[in-house]
Amino acid sequence: MIILRVVNVAVPLKRIDKIRWEIPKFDKRMKVPGRVYADDVLIEKMRQDRTLEQAANVAMLPGIYKYSIVMPDGHQGYGFPIGGVAAFDIKEGVISPGGIGYDINCLAPGTKVLTEHGYWLKIEEMPEKFKLQRLRLYNIEEGHNDFSRVAFVAERNIEKDETAIRIVTETGTLIEGSEDHPVLTPQGYVYLKNIKEGDYVIVYPFEGVPYEEKKGIIIDESAFEGEDPQVIKFLKERNLLPLRWEDPKIGTLARILGFALGDGHLGEMGGRLVLAFYGREETLRELKKDLESLGIKANLYVREKNYRIKTESGEYSGKTVLAELRVSSRSFALLLEKLGMPRGEKTKKAYRIPVWIMEAPLWVKRNFLAGFFGADGSIVEFKGTTPLPIHLTQAKDVALEENLKEFLYDISRILEEFGVKTTIYKVNSKKSVTYRLSIVGEENIRNFLGKINYEYDPKKKAKGLIAYAYLKFKESVKKERRKAMEISKKIYEETGNIDRAYKAVKDIVNRRFVERTIYEGERNPRVPKNFLTFEEFAKERGYEGGFVAEKVVKVERIKPEYDRFYDIGVYHEAHNFIANGIVVHNCGVRLIRTNLTEKDVRPKIKQLVDTLFKNVPSGVGSQGKVRLHWTQIDDVLVDGAKWAVDQGYGWERDLERLEEGGRMEGADPDAVSQRAKQRGAPQLGSLGSGNHFLEVQVVDKIFDEEIAKAYGLFEGQVVVMVHTGSRGLGHQVASDYLRIMERAIRKYGIPWPDRELVSVPFQSEEGQRYFSAMKAAANFAWANRQMITHWVRESFQEVFRQDPEGDLGMEIVYDVAHNIGKVEEHEVDGKKVKVIVHRKGATRAFPPGHEAIPKIYRDVGQPVLIPGSMGTASYVLAGTEGAMAETFGSTCHGAGRVLSRAAATRQYRGDRIRDELLRRGIYVRAASMRVVAEEAPGAYKNVDNVVKVVSEAGIAKLVARMRPIGVAKG
């Protein structure tokens, strides 16, 4: 199979010096050049995605000054690159949510969007249903399919005289959308208008089934009568009770149950009810993700085992790897039992397919079967061009023969609903009775692979998808030959001339085919003898993860008969989704110092990190300890960190050491939607997950003694770094205003070089309203970090039994935002101008003397905080005049990812990373080992390189380096 790697070669680069590059104005729409700060290694990383293209697109926006800038930690974002900086005139320029911190794809109504559970929804149905969906997508970096929650669904009116592009592939796959809608090809993303007949597009070859809604309760509390009340409490906390048909989690549970009936065991172990699954390590890792999505923890055990087997032909020995995934939660084990999982040895138990599965909508049955075949179904195999039968073999004690047959007949009846006919027959076995269900024949196998396929086993799944694409391709060739047969017959009947009959179809078939059709009465055309075998097809057309390249055979420009286009935005960094089978496309940091040294803290580091983990809520969807209703957070949005201090979370002087004093003037809570407030209210005072963290660090190197002294830093000192932002509220604000701006952009006639690069005039009603909402989100983030600071101080007091203020000296060094837009005054061509600076994944870096810097730091410059990746160094830098002159007072914000989170989990194991860090003297406490794997040091660029570039460029000055000794992560 092919590994797809997208390399951007379209954007020219001119080297200025060792660490500066220029993107010349190669496109006449560019108003300014691009400026990139990177060494040779970092620039190559940027060439591999759309970073440079996005920087060039930003240079086309109205009112931009000097350069479109990319910092050394830059990588592809949404519209703007992450690590991007741009300044726009406040009168003539624009404002863009994508340039402040956000990560949309326009398609025709009727387009089928594939979801996690293998059912599809029409894109126009998504606005009502997207909150419940996770969509399938193609993770290019990893080369496999993945899932993402939907950030938003946007729609826009089709402009007068606007046309759409419709493309059709060789197997009949069709997609229709606006000219500038990007689709994935083997060469990277290409706009629909640039696709030509004969080009290839990347397809996810899975048909799925339509969504069918069913309402009602499957299981409620009454099913657990007599059980410990803690069981019900546990399930309710995870929204697993009551179980309703309309909950998408039903698809996940059906998949898990299917796999459990194949390769699972429910039984007593050491007096406890335990649920265990068996299989290959990579299969169980996929299953573990599903369990974790339900809030169920599972432990994976992998070990090598020596084996020795005696057979009639000889004795064999070797090593095999055994993997087991164990769920110790009695509550979940009981739930799965109630859903139909038998307790004890399955071969000794009589059971049927659960009634709720038999009565479920087709999409639920699909998930059950895919899980079951993922465990016990045979992988699809071919002999040349012909698929061999897919088998499902089951065994039971002889006394349960009738029950075994009934069980397989249940499976057969469900399969028939998908157009899959089967045969069931007995297989000879010595100790038990064994029956086999077989899917035989090309049409049945094609229907199985295209509508059901396998789940959990990546190898089975990928091969099954490519096999389905092959069988579709084969069928399309046979259909074309059938058509040639009919044409040649008709012409021969009309003319009696075989030469004419052959001439009409010679581009499709050879003369011998026409002769067989006319003289021998051939009725069922076969593929030609030189037709690709499956293995050849997989090698030439198959991509990792089961994706396939299909040739485009028809491209049309059409006048839409509908009045709207639709877009979907996803959270995943891949920024795509699967439509009709085709792949289409304020955070901040705070540093708190202490009077403690490593010698003081090292003996208590485990206790300290555990206490921080306990006192500061963290993890996916984590909720704060403060309970505010969404109607009560307006004061937070207006006053930011000041609100938190007024409520007792910190000291009045804290506000002097925060960017903007922890509060941006002009925030308007009425500009923030109810949905955003509902998402933010329960998360206030929480860390979140992903790359957000609390880190206990030691200052291990001072580069500038004078500035370090001004910042209160000394070698050997213990400090705490906090990285978190505005949580779900900020993301929702961006989602809301992207939709608003999509509708407004044409009204203002703003150039739109990239559909992701939505913007409106800064002085427009929409622009000002968004700016007010962005300020409110920034204030929420400052309040959030202020509350966390308070709990950090309390944690130190709890562990060291000393007063945070009088004894420990726990002062804030500084707090910087790195996804924000600011109105600032800068010098351009010798004149002072007011601009709206967009910093996306970039940090403000003002020089000595600037009035926006706290008085205590005004002589040395603004502190700049650069977090490294988990287990690597972080840095404190100082703002410089160089930054003011070159980058609108901006510098980098961190290391920048080189592996997606999912790629990191495949390459690293969380427990091994944790253990390795512990050997290096770094204690890690995390909500899950998955998060540790996602944030492995190897998933990021080398922060030392990034910092070296900005230092050499003179856009920040090195002050101090810190190394971690303890990490708390969500």
UniProtKB/Swiss-Prot annotation:
Keywords annotated in UniProt: Autocatalytic cleavage, DNA-binding, Endonuclease, GTP-binding, Hydrolase, Intron homing, Ligase, Manganese, Metal-binding, Nuclease, Nucleotide-binding, Protein splicing, tRNA processing
Protein name, entry field: tRNA-splicing ligase RtcB
Organism annotation: Pyrococcus furiosus (strain ATCC 43587 / DSM 3638 / JCM 8422 / Vc1)
Note: Ligation proceeds through 3 nucleotidyl transfer steps, with 2',3'-cyclic phosphate termini being hydrolyzed to 3'-P termini in a step that precedes 3'-P activation with GMP. In the first nucleotidyl transfer step, RtcB reacts with GTP to form a covalent RtcB-histidine-GMP intermediate with release of PPi; in the second step, the GMP moiety is transferred to the RNA 3'-P; in the third step, the 5'-OH from the opposite RNA strand attacks the activated 3'-P to form a 3',5'-phosphodiester bond and release GMP.
Function: Essential for tRNA splicing and maturation. Acts by directly joining spliced tRNA halves to mature-sized tRNAs. Joins RNA with 2',3'-cyclic-phosphate or 3'-phosphate ends to RNA with 5'-hydroxy ends.
Family: Belongs to the RtcB family.
Keyword Zinc recorded: no
EC assignment: 6.5.1.8, 3.1.-.-
Catalysis: reaction(s): a 3'-end 3'-phospho-ribonucleotide-RNA + a 5'-end dephospho-ribonucleoside-RNA + GTP = a ribonucleotidyl-ribonucleotide-RNA + GMP + diphosphate; a 3'-end 2',3'-cyclophospho-ribonucleotide-RNA + a 5'-end dephospho-ribonucleoside-RNA + GTP + H2O = a ribonucleotidyl-ribonucleotide-RNA + GMP + diphosphate + H(+)
